[in-house]
Amino acid sequence: MAAHRAPRGTGRRRGGRPGPRHSKRDDAKKGRGADPPRRTAYDVLAAVQDRQAYANLLLPRLLAERGITGRDAALATELTYGTLRGLGTYDAVLAACSDRPLDKLDPPVLQVLRLGAHQLLSTRVAAHAAVATSVDLARAVAGPRVSGYVNAVLRRVATRDLDAWLPLVAPDPATDTDGYLAVRYSYPRWIVAAYRDALGPAADTELEAALAAGNDRPRVTMAAFPGGPLREEIMPEGAEPTRWSPYGFTLAGGDPAALVATGTAAVQDEASQQAAIALATAPIDGQDRLWLDMAAGPGGKARLLYGLAGEAGARLVAVDVHEHRAALVRDALARAPHGESGDAAVIAADGRRPAWQDGAFDRVLLDVPCSGLGALRRRPEARWRKSESDLPALAGLQRALLRSALAACRPGGVVAYVTCSPVAAETRDVVTEVVSSTPGTEILDAPAILSAVPDVRSPAPEFAQLWPHRHTTDAIFVALLRRTR
């Protein structure tokens, strides 16, 4: 696409929450090497692109290894996650400012341009500093010959704010609403369409809010251990109790590692807590002695279920197909304060080829492997890593696991089918297909069982769907199924 040479202008940048302020030390002098926060953000973006790394795992490790703390750590974090969230929008603007197609650029150059575009369009970093530090970074990672090109492209980006760029680079919302929203909120078009379908009739008024909420910076949410100290006894200063889970609280800031190390709490989104609570409180017929977490790694829900099972006098069996993830579950349960909790067994096994007899369990939690499109606030790269063509294989695995979960549950017992995706192909379509082909299975009213949480009914009203824009949680889907024979 030919370069768009607009006159230099001023104006506000993208609306919403601003990035961190920065001092004059961010105003890099020409010729200086790449500064540590920007180099670290670049290294994470490159690893996400080239090695399928996860930013939420790699960034904390690099910050610790490089001794980056305080304001510099905040800058590296903002640049990493902000660039990943806004990548689709920034690419549209960069394409209008470049005389070379973006897919013909060397990957290091493209990543530097994206970092620069994020600073120019969505943070308070001064334009001259954003351009100068990006040129320094380009020299460091791609050599001196690209510096002129990077400088020219980013100077063109800086001629307008994001609100002024959008009408130039996005489709007309009057004729292509989904295309406009895809560029405006930085999503692949197919995810915009999938969210529209998942919201059903509510999409007319809520789709834009749902997409915007997927770009929010989430606060850290934790769960106290049932049977251990009450959350009010362990909440640090500034923390707030969650609205609906009696175990959850959100941190005002800081590192949750100290609380995690004590075993009294673990990081867990409130929607994930509600999924475990839904299984534990769903009515069953007969005994209530043995619970199964069928895809338990890395252990967040298993830990909460362990405490809930202990309070009910039940035993938990936690399973994951991968031994290293089963080891994470063992570690999570071993750190929990035992208090009233019952015992637990953790095994590595494939839920599709179970190591237990049919009908062995009273309650079964199945948190299936999924696209992760309900957790984009925490893992923004998932939107660029997944494609619509991935869904049929995922749905096939999900159906197989759900059939196995129903077989593991005794008559009168309950299965919770949970995904961190709102996409119909992974949620209501999977459940309705499996239930229709599995005699002796009925669908319970999940929203009624989660009655403390408002506005969770999905377009299929017997299923519960939480949303970031409604509940400030991940977009978790919950279906509750009972075996009748």
Regions found by a protein language model. Name each.
Residues 1-485:
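S-adenosylmethionine
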